[in-house]
Amino acid sequence: MNPTRYARICEMLARRQPDLTVCMEQVHKPHNVSAIIRTADAVGVHEVHAVWPGSRMRTMASAAAGSNSWVQVKTHRTIGDAVAHLKGQGMQILATHLSDNAVDFREIDYTRPTCILMGQEKTGITQEALALADQDIIIPMIGMVQSLNVSVASALILYEAQRQRQNAGMYLRENSMLPEAEQQRLLFEGGYPVLAKVAKRKGLPYPHVNQQGEIEADADWWATMQAAG
């Protein structure tokens, strides 16, 4: 990988916000899933979460994985599992839902560890999910339409989170908050995508990428990579 590419990936890693995420509860249209993931990447989200029960899990996970190779998609079989995982990371759970207790999405402090919960396109967030959320939020609507597309709504909220975090200097870190192993994975997959595919296919561990963006691997690793099959 050339120095420019290495520097760009390192800059991206330093700006990643591991304590900001989105959870999609049965969002089932691939174009919406893809759009949400692209926006998540644009504001520095490292990992998004999705609840896809039963047989839809594999299909939707595959569609999501193809949306953006820089954003991880963690799937959960139930919303209870997802929320328990996220609250275990100290995140506030915000549900996009009109209720008597809902507040304008811009009134929330997004510099706190935050998960934005988005519901299924037609039916919205389930009652089970609403009961688990910490706060309902709304996007004010002053026209004739009553709702926005789920990917549009998530984009508005994510960019408010990005605005607040940028003002707080949370994108100015010199070092990434991601674990070293995760940084190495992204450096190799992003800097050497062809080699990464071969290594995956052959079941080889990823090599170390040094501070010059160069691969550090022994002769046996290279020999296995170059062998036919």
Swiss-Prot record:
This is tRNA (guanosine(18)-2'-O)-methyltransferase. S-adenosyl-L-methionine binds at residues 96, 139, 148. Belongs to the class IV-like SAM-binding methyltransferase superfamily. RNA methyltransferase TrmH family. It is an enzyme of class 2 (transferase). GO terms for biological process: tRNA guanine ribose methylation; tRNA methylation. The keyword S-adenosyl-L-methionine applies. Its EC number is 2.1.1.34. GO terms for molecular function: tRNA (guanine(18)-2'-O)-methyltransferase activity; tRNA binding. Keywords: Methyltransferase, RNA-binding, S-adenosyl-L-methionine, Transferase, tRNA processing, tRNA-binding. The keyword tRNA-binding applies. InterPro entries: Alpha/beta_knot_MTases, rRNA_MeTrfase_SpoU_C, SpoU_MeTrfase, TrmH, tRNA_m1G_MTases_N. Catalyzes the 2'-O methylation of guanosine at position 18 in tRNA. Type II methylase, which methylates only a subset of tRNA species. It catalyses: guanosine(18) in tRNA + S-adenosyl-L-methionine = 2'-O-methylguanosine(18) in tRNA + S-adenosyl-L-homocysteine + H(+). The lineage of its organism: Bacteria, Pseudomonadati, Pseudomonadota, Gammaproteobacteria, Enterobacterales.
